[in-house]
């Protein structure tokens, strides 16, 4: 989705409303449970371990998370595992290519962003191109010439440009038809969207249109206009990216879709200004609301445009098909190309480029050749010293502090040493299970239990969750056939409401507890139907196409009837994690502190920080040799969206 509003209910859209509709048809492949599941638990209670509380800046959790590849959500496999249909769910719903005629009417499911609901709309087929069908909703006055004008732009410019740069969509796709369907009509809350739900059978999601298609809001982009064409360029990249790397981080996917608009000759709107007006916007995250997300569009687009200018088309286009996500994807394509730079190196130069925008400086690394950014917002400006200030900054976001005045100065910086992944503490002890987070992903935590000696059983555990409400869901499940199929179990706080079509049963969504922030709550699940035998228990976290929250955390898991108790302190205890991680919720906070010195020439120096995140730089001849200086402060810790606090003190040098 783009800032003009292309996307609903978690589709990938253009900004008017931001949802996450970018599902996947990538297969994970179902298999029998691994041998590790054979470890069963009977009636031996496990004592609580004595574990030291965290101190210092251990990177234990960071190293663990860096080694995890978050699994892609495979809806065909989910349909089989959750027994959504008595018959196998087909990947392609038509055995032969369908036929449509001009003037034909068809009913479509349209997503409504604000309510997460869908409604049916009737549209007439007004144009058939070599690669597209054009459907106009009944009740809207649109001339044939307008439709043909937009169709010509899509067929002659957008389709070949996007395919040449980003790759191919799934074709002939779910409907066995190589043409893409374009619906234009009442699409509330967004400019338009691509939603991967439509790439699947209705047996998986009842609101699927079972077609490769885009939805365009006619109130935001009428046929015959550049606005409609730019939205199609944006959404077509999403469609291609879904086929190549379905669970790519939203910020990468959206940045490339904004880049697709530029490659096709269209303006990206006000997203650049939205970011330069709010540079303390995390590049590697995404906003929950349209207002929050516009600056993220700007950040991700600028980073992609900078990357393209610096490394060229070949390396940039490799990002789409690269299976590694986010920063890891950049590192992978750079390494494969034999380049020494890595994501953090590029980010450091990008921070400078966003302030200076001088393409003639430092081999072009400190500016943009094809963009004119305008001024970036300054967080603070000083001209009298000494001065001391405390502030916070996002991860992979930046505060710019301008230093004016005269003389020689000393800058002292101190930042916090640790940061959390989620804004909680373990319910007991130090460790907890974390679902991990990602888009279009499927994380599981599984263990086998022996209930053969009891007639009833209860699964008890404490849970803390902050999940994208109505779009992403977590479940607890049971299997008696070795993990081939699973039954979703109800809990105290689960819901069966399913406005988006994403809830497979009794799911947790939104925030745990009744407060404004998530809280630990105790869940109890009846396992009595499985008493008398062995049962596999699984926690599963499923996310949709775009936007994700901190996730789902577990602690103090018990089945009292068999004497089982696990406070997560002593290790994995037989749990098999696929995407989940046993964490202490402590990451070492890292910072990037740079000083831009502007005079007859420009120089950038980086502050070295010690183990306590403290460092010092000197500024000489301010007001004489130097016109001014700019201190840039960025958080630089992956795997979290929590902000980092810091303090700087600037005083005249003795």
State the predicted function of each range:
Residues 36-85:
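Intrinsically disordered, low-structural-confidence terminal and linker regions
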Residues 39-42, 325-444, 462, 470-477, ...:
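Beta/coil-rich, acidic/histidine-enriched accessory regions frequently appended to metallopeptidases
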Residues 127-256, 264-286:
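Juxtacatalytic substrate-recognition/specificity segment
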Residues 140, 432-444, 467, 510-519:
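Extracellular beta-rich ligand/substrate-recognition surface
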Residues 197-199, 203-209, 226, 230-231, ...:
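Acidic/His/Gly-enriched intrinsically disordered linker/tail segments
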Residues 309, 450-452, 462-468, 540-542:
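Solvent-exposed strand-to-loop "edge" motifs in beta-rich extracellular domains
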Residues 457-463, 535-542, 568, 631:
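Extracellular beta-strand-rich recognition modules
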Residues 477-534, 572, 582-592, 596-614:
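Exoplasmic/lumenal beta-rich domain surfaces
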